[in-house]
Amino acid sequence: MRHAADALLTGIGTIVADNPLLTDRSGRSRRRRLLRVILDSQLRLSPQSQIVKTADDDLLVFTAASLDSPKARKLQRAGVELVRARARGGRIDLQAVLIELGRRDILSVLLEAGPTLNGTALEARLIDKFVLFYSPKIAGDGKVPFAHARRLNRNPLERVQARQIGPDLCVEAYPLTPRR
């Protein structure tokens, strides 16, 4: 899936929790380099994180924090492009982020995030397609893929398909409610 996207979007919570690389490991040639995009209102991104250590003009961070701080300058020297963004209630304005990505000719965005950012995108009706993976575990951590998951009932899905990929279950579906 990462191979098919122009950009991969995540929140700082995912970066802090998992320290991922967020790269396309398909081994296939790409039309353009995968742009890794992080929403980080307070600029909590560590210069020591794997994603920063592998930054090579492919890491874009939207933040409401000052771009003149020593930490911001250190991240910029490491190859991170910082973009000042509006924040409401401590969260980066997702609609404004997508507009900026569109200005950069980013046409497809893969959202790989935690429940808060997933829930925000869901509530704003910014999701075209859902692809959810479930691992076959009897007991889990009780986390849900979307914050405010009860509101999913107001967003019915259609064309639901499920298939097994290795040991995991992959569910694909499309929102029935038209996007804004």
Task: Please provide the spans of the model-predicted regions.
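Enzymes that bind and transform nitrogen-containing heteroaromatic metabolites
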Residues: 1-180
